[in-house]
Amino acid sequence: MILSIESSCDDSSIAITRLEDRAILFHKKISQDSAHSPHGGVVPELASRLHAVALPKILEECAPFFPRLKAIAVTNEPGLSVTLLEGVMMAKALALALHLPLIAVNHLKGHLYSLFLEQESRFPLDVLLVSGGHTMVLHARSFGEIEIIGQSMDDSFGESFDKVAKMLSLGYPGGPIVESYAKEGDASRFPLPLPLAGKKEVAFSFSGLKNAVRLVIQSLQNPPNEQEKRDICASFQATAIAHLIQKCRLYLATSNAPYLAIVGGASANLALREEMERLGEHFGKKLLLAPLAYCSDNAAMIGRAALESYALGAFTSPLELTVRPRTPSLC
């Protein structure tokens, strides 16, 4: 069994994964949404303090598994440095105390392997990764061969939802709230510019779109009413998704990978899933989706990725493991 820890942002999570059949024997996550909601976004220092309280509580429930553990795994990159440290320090202490090997896991690779929590691994694979911190197109040939094709030059897809929700005083996290409002809105009422429309490169930008939403709100004579909020959300979501699809289309036209996937917390957006399904059909690629329960940050996906490292004997010394807020690659 592998005990895995996730604390890269504002979710405290620990999981136990069985080596033989990849079964998840234990998984628990404590969200911090209510604590960060008044601030309209994650406050790193607050998140770190909450991890320091939540992780030990979850770990107590894992004690019965300790005698059968074969390794400890932890997210060490990328993420908020102060929150990553909470998980890494716990993992180091466990590895040393229990005399177990330590596995460092890239958080983004964890999201990729959330696809394979309930199905077999399938490669080669083109992936759209969308979360609160990242927006990327990846090409994965295997566990150790993952190429970053393109990424956002500024805000991420998920982050832009949070910021639009804050502009409209809708609350936090913004993703599910904006999606809910968009379902009842008219996307044609407030036309918004498609980012990087004339650029023939696989890259993303959401800062201009975010500013366009701000200008729409400022153009109204009064603060937006509920229907105007719905219409703004509908227009924003439709434009943001169209931007993703346009850039993915550019790359997929050049790729021979038989599989297409979408991962990350924002991949739970049903409108985006539907558009990706259509995109996959257009290019003759089978769309792979992570279970909705494992789209957001969680330790189960970290454990699943750690199984691959364990099989390769890719361990890290507890005395040498450090956190890396940014990651140059996924290999």
Curated annotation (Swiss-Prot):
Keyword annotations for this protein, in alphabetical order, are: Acyltransferase, Cytoplasm, Iron, Metal-binding, Transferase, tRNA processing
Necessary cofactors = Fe(2+)
| Binding residues annotated for Fe cation, in chain numbering | 107, 111, 297
Q: Which GO terms describe its biological process?
A: tRNA threonylcarbamoyladenosine modification
Record's Pfam families? TsaD
Give the Enzyme Commission number. Answer: 2.3.1.234
Q: Name one GO molecular function term.
A: N(6)-L-threonylcarbamoyladenine synthase activity
Instruction: Report the enzyme's class at the first EC level.
Output: transferase
What broad class describes the main subcellular location of this protein?
A: cytoplasm
Please tell me where substrate binds in this chain: 129-133, 162, 175, 269
Subcellular compartments: Cytoplasm
Q: Which PANTHER family match?
A: TRNA N6-ADENOSINE THREONYLCARBAMOYLTRANSFERASE, TRNA N6-ADENOSINE THREONYLCARBAMOYLTRANSFERASE, MITOCHONDRIAL
Protein family: Belongs to the KAE1 / TsaD family.
Q: What is the documented function of this protein?
A: Required for the formation of a threonylcarbamoyl group on adenosine at position 37 (t(6)A37) in tRNAs that read codons beginning with adenine. Is involved in the transfer of the threonylcarbamoyl moiety of threonylcarbamoyl-AMP (TC-AMP) to the N6 group of A37, together with TsaE and TsaB. TsaD likely plays a direct catalytic role in this reaction.
Q: What is this protein called?
A: tRNA N6-adenosine threonylcarbamoyltransferase
State the species of origin.
Wolinella succinogenes (strain ATCC 29543 / DSM 1740 / CCUG 13145 / JCM 31913 / LMG 7466 / NCTC 11488 / FDC 602W) (Vibrio succinogenes)
User: Gene name?
Assistant: tsaD
